[in-house]
Every structure is written in structure tokens, then in C-alpha cells.
Amino acid sequence: MTSVLALETSCDESAAALVWRDADGRFEVSSARIASQVEEHARWGGVVPEIASRRHVEALPGLIQQVLDESDSTLAEVDAIAATVTPGLAGALMVASVTGRTLSALRDRPFLAVHHLEGHLASVHLAEHRPQLPYLVLLVSGGHTELIRVEADGAMERLGRSHDDAAGEAFDKVARLLGLGYPGGPAIQAAAEGGDGRRFKLPKGRISLPEGGFHPYDFSFSGLKTAMLRTVEAQSGPLPTADLAASFEQVVVDVLVERSLRCAMDHGLEELVMVGGVAANRRLRQTLEQRSNAVGVRVSVAPLAYCTDNAAMIGAAALLRWDAGARGCSLRTGVSARWPLAQVDQLYTEQPAF
């Protein structure tokens, strides 16, 4: 078995995990720990980068020790060390990156630089049921909403994306509009319980093609956000928060499910994988399961514990790289707030990508 100590500090979650992979390709998470900053950032209505970086510095060493202790392991017994290096908040990324590279140098262990989105894509491999390649991934999080085809050889092709707000970002902004607090995903889900999701008619944003018509797989949530603002402003008397939250949640779910299933069927893909923080949404999981069964598309969803940012998914991504032949990145590798997923292989070239 191969083991990796994985570190994640790309935004507001400090995380460490010890992940193993056996000869049959099965993953085992022997320990995974997260120190969340949600309550602290909630006071500001969103993530404050400087605060996030400071809290990562304070939390990460203790998380690493806790993970090793719970796994009854030591750094000397770990085969490699991995850390998220892109994309994310640059200052926050530096904490895991510098820590990981320092431990790699001190213990003479390979360092594996991981793209945060590659981590989300790998999270589904931590489920009991492993998806069968090729498949379509719906990556839906606070910063990204994309449809990605994954081939049998691991090659990836983006087939759809959001042209403005990501779905998770829209949840945060609408939650703020409704006075529900941060983070928006869980807040709207809770508020929508018992609400009428069909009471308010809201737009399903589409992207026009230059030659006419609409792109069948792309997303746009900015118009929906504006429509919610106008709907709220048009209300008189007490705000029907439950119905507003349910109507917003329902239209986002409908758009994500409809376009994902259409993309899968149009490309002859029999399995749809859903990952990312928004994949934790209960209505989305239930609706996708129901509608996929109706059209004969299998669905795999990342385990609930590994939908939001965590280090176990970073470890899984690193181990997939390891089994594909990667044996480490340059210790001169830095961090980047943005880096295309399509160029992730450049992290493993002799010359650091950044």
C-alpha cells in the first residue's frame, strides 16, 4: 500500500489527512481532520483572506500531529506528502504548500502538488462505489460550475461551464439577500424546508451562441440572482423566506440536473459523477438520483464528508498521480490563485509551472 499525508488550505478550511491506496486501487482514509473558520468569517458575510491565512498557520501543525497520532503513524512511515497549490487564495495556499514542501525536504519524501479541482474530481473515488470510466463529472462548488468528461486514460475535456457566478457563489449571494447568513448553501437548504419551490417563477439562465440559439451545457446564474433581488423588492409585508429560498434552490437544481443529464446522454456517457461543495445539497442529490434513473444514467456522488473542502480528496488525487507514475514535483513549486485544470500536468514537469 502507498500512503500520502495530504494538506489543504486553499480557502477557509484547514485540513490534513492520511490516505492509503492498495494494489487493487481501493482507497482508505485512516484519519482526516478539518479546522473550520466558518463562524469567524460569517461575521463578515464572506471569507476574509488575511484572517484565513492566519488561522491556517495556527491550525495546520496541530491537525497534522492529530492525523498521525490517530493513524498510529509517523512522518517516517509516509511515502509522500501532498498539498493544494492552486487555485485559491494565494496567502492561504502558501500555508499548506510551504508546510508540505518543508516536511518533504526534512524527511526526504516526494512532494506532490495538487490542483484543488483535481482533488474534487478524485473525491468520488473515496466512495464505496467507484465510477466506471469514461464518465461525465458535474463539478459544482463555491468557485466553479463545470461539466468535465473524464476518459479511460484520465484525459479530461471540459464540455460546459458557468460564464459568471458559480452555483455555490449564487447560493452565498442569495442567502445574504434573504438575510440568512454565511455560508449560503446550508442556510438556503435549511430555510427552504417546507417552502413552496414553485411559488415564484425564476429564470433558467442560458448562454447565447454567436450563430444563434443557446449553448446546451453552459450555465449562467447572474440573471437568476438579479431576478431574486427584484422578487424580494416586490414583496409587501413579511418576506416569504421559505418560499423564496425553495424557489431559488429548485431552479438551480433543475438547471444543474437538466443540463448535466443532457450532456451525458448527448455524449453517450452512461455514468454521471457529482462532486464539490454544492453536491452536499439534499434536494440536488435527490433530484439527480430520481431523474437519472428515468433516463438510464448511473450516478455516483462524492461521500457527504468529502463534498466540501477537505484533505482526503487531495490525498486521493495525489495517489492517482502516484499510480500514474508521478514521483514528485520540484520543491521550488509555488502557488497560484488561478491555474487552468487543463494545464494541471505542468505541475509535474521539471520546470515549476509557477
From Swiss-Prot:
Alphabetical list of CDD domains matching this protein: ASKHA_NBD_TsaD_bac
GO MF term set: iron ion binding; N(6)-L-threonylcarbamoyladenine synthase activity
Domain of life from the UniProt record: Bacteria
Cofactor(s), by name: Fe(2+)
EC number: 2.3.1.234
UniProt keyword list: Acyltransferase, Cytoplasm, Iron, Metal-binding, Transferase, tRNA processing
Subcellular location: Cytoplasm
Entry's Gene Ontology BP terms: tRNA threonylcarbamoyladenosine modification
Keyword Iron (UniProt): yes
Catalytic activity: L-threonylcarbamoyladenylate + adenosine(37) in tRNA = N(6)-L-threonylcarbamoyladenosine(37) in tRNA + AMP + H(+)
Chain sites annotated for binding substrate: 139-143, 172, 185, 281
Keyword Flavoprotein: no
Residues involved in Fe cation binding: 116, 120, 309
Cellular component terms (Gene Ontology): cytoplasm
Name under which the protein is recorded: tRNA N6-adenosine threonylcarbamoyltransferase
Gene assigned in the entry: tsaD
